[in-house]
UniProtKB/Swiss-Prot annotation:
Catalyzed reactions per annotation: 8-amino-3,8-dideoxy-alpha-D-manno-octulosonate + CTP = CMP-8-amino-3,8-dideoxy-alpha-D-manno-oct-2-ulosonate + diphosphate
GO cellular component terms, A-Z: cytosol
Annotated InterPro entries: Cytidylyl_trans, KdsB, Nucleotide-diphossugar_trans
Function: Activates KDO8N (a required 8-carbon sugar) for incorporation into bacterial lipopolysaccharide in the Shewanella genus.
UniProt source species: Shewanella pealeana (strain ATCC 700345 / ANG-SQ1)
The protein, known as: 8-amino-3,8-dideoxy-manno-octulosonate cytidylyltransferase
Pathway: Bacterial outer membrane biogenesis; lipopolysaccharide biosynthesis
Subcellular location: Cytoplasm
Amino acid sequence: MNVTLLIPARYGSSRFPGKPLAHINGKPMIQHVYERASLAKGLKDIYVATDDVRIKNAVESFGGKVVMTGENAASGTDRIDEAISILGLADDDLVINLQGDQPLIDPIVIEQLVSVCERHAGEFDMATLGVEIKDEAQLNDPNHVKVVFDNNHNALYFSRARIPFGRDTSDYPVYKHIGIYAYTRKFIQTFAKLPLGRLEELEKLEQLRALEYGYKIKVAISAFDFPEVDTPEDIRICEARLTVD
């Protein structure tokens, strides 16, 4: 199974314009993501998928590979869909979609996701990761997406709200979704053609489209958590973690 990792990156952001190029300890964030991903074993190729020449130049300056996509991609998934067509990947090639706002991604979780797909090929349509929330502040923070899953670790729902809700107790695990996905080229091309889902539009969560149309999402549980960058304030958190690491 050939495995290609793609990092969709766009310059425009309502909360944090230019986020992929924001410097963290002297390097643009996209470089941290790329270099950490490159430590994962079993990957054939890594590319940044972008429509912005500033991001392209930054990635190429540190030796990274870039796929230039069009400016009209409505979402990261649409950008991934266009990139895999440009790259000419085979239908059964595995594609890892790693968000460009995860400069502290542990390569072990990438390997974990690939392993799940290899061991359980054909049992689900896409796979992702979750981690038990240990920080109380994340429980009611809509920037930290929660996930619930069945006994076979197939996703039941993703939400920006705290789920599940304990009517009589607060002593139970809540899982946060980690924004990394795995799927075949064939599935992502099917997914990208689906109309937007009602729940997807309400929550602004793309993965809900798959559930709304009856596709299975496997949720593997990670032992590692790491901060994502949603706002400029998150940069300081990442810098502190990198100093400790």
